[in-house]
Amino acid sequence: MLPDRGKQIATEPIEVKQGRLFETEPTFSNRSTKAVTFQGKLTLPVHRWYRLTPSFSPELADDIAGHFKLTRDDFVLDPFSGVGTVPLCMKHRGISACSVEINPYLHFVGTVKTRDYTALDAIESTFKRFIAEYRSSLERVPYESAPGDYLREHAEDIPRINSPERWWSPGNMAQLVSLRRTVMGFVSEPHHMDLVRMAVLGILIPVSNAKHNHVSLTFAKKPLPTVDIAGTLEQQLARMLRDLRAVSNYPAPVINVYLGNSKHLTSVLPEQTKISAVITSPPYPNRFSYARETRPHLFFFDFIDGASAVGQLETDAIGGTWGKATSVLSEGVKPKNELVDGLLAPYLHGINVSGDLMASYIVKYFNDLYDHASEVAKVCKEQARLAYVIGNSKFYEHPLPSDELLASVFGHFGFKLERIDRMRKRQSKTGLYEAVVFMRR
């Protein structure tokens, strides 16, 4: 029972229900938004544990696996793991898979979501013990009457994110600091403890001043009032436990999520890894920053050392454009070879006239993509099938057909284009779409 029935519990405006397996034959043109984007995972068990807006639908990953006629003899790679959508879908199909993720927080998400959990009663007991301990700790926190005093006394426990007061109101931040301290002192089986951390990280944005009103998080004009964070967390833990029970009879193939850079796959994956299918969605060339989007999570449990490390993470990532990466772009970036130069030349002239920074961004993106494609070629079997979900871009009203350019880069490494299906129109600008690029070795 909650201590105060009148206090608000922060929740996402999402219908909570168990998902179903996908029953229709896959089609890839004129798909609904739910069948392409993150919206497709909001009601599916385990997939819904953390919302990342620029992630794609489990239904799409499942449809691609069906289109490829993958069996349990196949081995699937997602080199841009994100929140683990592809490896989790493959797990539920009984197909072994691996994925690679450069962001340490997102690597954690994918790892926790794709693990096997069998001791569900013990997990439930851990959840109950943790909530009880957290509620007990809150009795000593004046988060309604004097949150500022508590925060000053425990300043060393506030996440090291820049301007934390922008992210959380004082009463909510005081509760989160107490929650963070409780997690650090709680003793449990490590994998069960990771589930608790996952639940905590999953509520950071719902109890914050940030909103999912756009592709990137934005701050609300009016800060969120003090809410019942213990109640919000208890709901999240209960939802996660229901999800684990819902998938408890699903197959349990080998799934591995590796921390590393997809531009260096052969250094990240075990030796002799041979992939029969790649299903993935790389960052779109649209200046979206995954490092910026996940800052609260990166800092809350110290997945990253500090602001400079976030800047380096952004610089190393394909499509990095925020923070330190902007300084790199401002110095100018040249095509790394004749292939990239020739592919981009028809598009860069108009963009260069309007802004050198954006031209450098595009060049860096496709330089990075070239390095990535060269590594994919080294780990794929003969006859491997590839599906890359990507959106096109517009820079100063100049279109950039990212799907076609990607196919050309992979063609250089021996991957034949089968077809490009443009799945849906995007709503942010006229002329934008999302496509899936099918290729075969």
Where do the model's predicted regions map?
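Acceptor-substrate binding/catalytic loop of class I
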Residues: 48-52, 159-167, 294, 356-367, ...
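Conserved S-adenosyl-L-methionine
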Residues: 57, 64-138, 232-267, 271-320, ...
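C-terminal target-recognition/interaction regions appended to catalytic cores
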Residues: 199, 203, 394-396, 426
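Core SAM-dependent methyltransferase catalytic element
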Residues: 381, 429-441
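Class I S-adenosyl-L-methionine-dependent methyltransferase module
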Residues: 96-99, 103-249, 291-355
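A short glycine-rich, Lys/Arg-flanked "PGG" loop and its adjoining helix->strand segment in the class I
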Residues: 367-382, 410
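Short glycine-centered segments of the SAM/dcSAM-binding site in methyltransferase folds
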Residues: 75, 195, 384-385
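S-adenosyl-L-methionine
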Residues: 1-72
